[in-house]
Amino acid sequence: MTFDAFTKVVAQADARGEFLSDAQLDALSRLVAEGNKRIDTVNRITGNASSIVANAARALFAEQPSLIAPGGNVYTNRRMAACLRDMEIILRYVTYAVFTGDASILDDRCLNGLRETYLALGVPGASVAEGVRKMKDAAVAIVSDRNGITQGDCSAIISELGSYFDKAAAAVA
C-alpha cells in the first residue's frame, strides 16, 4: 500500500523531470504517520490478544452463566476451546482490517456465512455478539491508552477499530 503510493509519486515527478514537491512530501509524511498509527494499534491488540479474549469470555460467562452450565452451549472443555478459538479468530481478522484500513478481509474470510454456521450448530448469535462487544471494549481501552504509542490524534483509528467490532457483532447476532 505505502510503497505503491511512494512509487507513484516518484514516477509522476520523474515523468515531469521535477523534484518531489513540498505538497507531495507532506502527503507521503501523512501516509507514513497514518501507517504508524495502524501498526501501533495492531501491535497493542496483538500483544494483548489472549487477555482480550479471556477477559471478554469471562465477563460473558459471568453475565450468562447458562452458557457454561451443564447442557449450555459452552459446556465441556471442547466447546469452551471452540468458543475461545472463534473469539480469537474474529479478533485476528479485526486486526487485519485495521492494518489494511479495509473491512473486506474481515467480511470475506471471517464473517461471511458465520451466522449461518452458528445457527446450524445451535450457537446463540446474541451471545457471540455480546462476546464480540466485550472484546471491542477491551481493545478500544487498550488502544486508547496513550502510553508508549505514536503521538497524534488517534480518534479516527479508534472509531474505525470500533466499527469493525460492530460489524462482526452485527454479522453474528
UniProtKB/Swiss-Prot annotation:
(2R,3E)-phycocyanobilin 2 binds at C154. (2R,3E)-phycocyanobilin 1 binds at C83. InterPro entries: Globin-like_sf, Phycobilisome_asu/bsu, Phycobilisome_asu/bsu_sf, Phycocyanin_b. GO terms for biological process: photosynthesis. The keyword Transport applies. It is found in: Cellular thylakoid membrane. Pfam families: Phycobilisome. The keyword Thylakoid applies. GO terms for cellular component: phycobilisome; plasma membrane-derived thylakoid membrane. Its main location: membrane. Coiled coil: none annotated. Contains two covalently linked bilin chromophores. The modification N4-methylasparagine is found at N73. It is a peripheral membrane protein. Keywords: Antenna complex, Bile pigment, Chromophore, Electron transport, Membrane, Methylation, Photosynthesis, Phycobilisome, Thylakoid, Transport. Light-harvesting photosynthetic bile pigment-protein from the phycobiliprotein complex (phycobilisome, PBS). Phycocyanin is the major phycobiliprotein in the PBS rod. Belongs to the phycobiliprotein family. Heterodimer of an alpha and a beta subunit, which further assembles into trimers and the trimers into hexamers. NCBIfam families: phycocy_beta (TIGR01339). This is C-phycocyanin-2 beta subunit. It comes from Synechococcus sp. (strain ATCC 27144 / PCC 6301 / SAUG 1402/1).
